[in-house]
Amino acid sequence: MEFIRNREFNSKTFICHIRKATQGEVTLRNTHPFVREMSAKMHVFAHNGKLGAFDQEQKLTGRFQPVGESDSEFSFCYLLDALAPLWQTGTVPDLDKRMDVISKFAKKIRSYGPANFIYADGDVL
């Protein structure tokens, strides 16, 4: 709390996460929330659950790669790969199109185990 009290933040949304590590070491690189920049927007992701073999069975095909070893960060990179084509114009994509990609992602990870996630794209949570 001291960190927050002593700093000035310019944001309407804050995401925090307390991790019970089930995959990957307890290190800074595996700490939630994960953040990546895409089209001048900060995309943020936190996840609870266990995704089984998701990170072994799925492939990352874009520029987003995990820094750590957690299934959560891998799944975030997978989601960003899927969303990237919508953000290529440099403007915020249509919300319905973004939600369609996110819904398909949620359906896919659901087949690997119980999980929930929080995702913000710099426009909506």
Predicted regions: what is each one?
Residues 1-47, 51-125:
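Conserved short alpha-helical segments that host acidic/polar catalytic motifs at enzyme active sites
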